[in-house]
């Protein structure tokens, strides 16, 4: 995921073409060929995004929700965070760095992230597709956020190689200290599953989405990545500069403990 994030941050037009226009094309094809259901898997980076990946994913959510107004297909989107052990996640990276004798590299020791296991993610995404109503944006309860520094220290301790150093490399462009997933609890409705919530987010009219897509298409055709990034800020109003969000978060957000979240599942 880190490599994908970095590539998209450095290639804004490519990210817009792939994520935004790619989603629009898939929605169009679903309508054309009579698909029954369309479920988008989104990310916590779409909440008040500070990077290109998050902003394009937020635009994708808006496209999917808007399509539900007049479309024949049942549309929904599900948002969740990092998956432990998946390709590109920090655990395989830290494991390799420990095996190589270190150091473990962190962009910032204050970074906090949500995690779930691959089985948890698979189960909840599939279930959210079943319970979602047309046009809904669902949010998964990822449990308590985990401090990446604690995760690194625990992995070093478990490996028995206590001489491994941890080195800060500095935040990457667009990187947040803390990913917002559940937004505000008062903005969420419960579902049949205690771990899945509905966000109270009204879809934009079809014409508004078409205008946003037109604006993005025009600027992308010019071939200027910075102009495309600025246009992305216009069409995704919640797209913030990372320094704004990181300054707000600062030292305020601390997980209650450094253990992995334990969740109770419904039978």
Give the ranges of each region predicted by the language model.
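Short, small-residue-biased leader/transition segments that mark boundaries at the very start
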Residues: 1-5, 174
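Glycine-rich nucleotide phosphate-binding loop and flanking beta-alpha elements
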Residues: 3, 45, 84
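Conserved Rossmann-fold NAD(P)-dependent oxidoreductase catalytic core, especially the SDR/UDP-sugar
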Residues: 6-61, 66-68, 75
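Strand-loop microenvironment adjacent to phosphate/nucleotide-handling motifs in alpha/beta enzyme folds
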Residues: 32, 62-82, 87-267
């Amino acid at each position: 995921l880190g490599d994908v994030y970095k590539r998209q941050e450095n290639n804004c037009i490519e990210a817009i073409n792939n994520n935004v226009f790619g989603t629009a094309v898939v929605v169009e094809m679903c309508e054309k060929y009579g698909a029954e259901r369309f479920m988008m898997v989104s990310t916590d980076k779409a909440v008040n995004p500070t990077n290109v990946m998050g902003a394009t994913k937020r635009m994708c959510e808006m496209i999917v929700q808007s399509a539900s107004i007049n479309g024949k297909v049942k549309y929904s989107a599900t948002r969740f965070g990092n998956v432990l052990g998946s390709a590109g996640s920090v655990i395989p990276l830290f494991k390799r760095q420990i095996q190589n004798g270190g150091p473990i590299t962190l962009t910032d020791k204050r970074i906090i992230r949500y995690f779930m296991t691959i089985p948890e993610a698979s189960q909840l995404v599939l279930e959210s597709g079943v319970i979602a109503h047309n046009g809904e944006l669902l949010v998964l309860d990822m449990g308590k956020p985990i401090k990446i520094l604690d995760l690194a220290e625990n992995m070093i301790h478990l490996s028995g190689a206590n001489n491994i150093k941890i080195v800060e490399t500095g935040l990457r462009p667009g990187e947040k200290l803390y990913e917002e997933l559940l937004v505000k609890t008062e903005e969420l409705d419960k579902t049949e599953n205690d771990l899945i919530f509905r966000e109270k987010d009204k879809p934009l009219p079809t014409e508004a989405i078409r205008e946003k897509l037109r604006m993005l298409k025009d600027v992308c055709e010019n071939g200027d990545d910075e102009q495309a990034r600025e246009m992305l800020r216009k069409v995704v109003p919640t797209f913030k500069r990372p320094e704004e969000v990181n300054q707000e978060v600062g030292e305020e957000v601390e997980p209650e403990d450094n253990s992995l979240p334990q969740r109770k599942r419904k039978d």
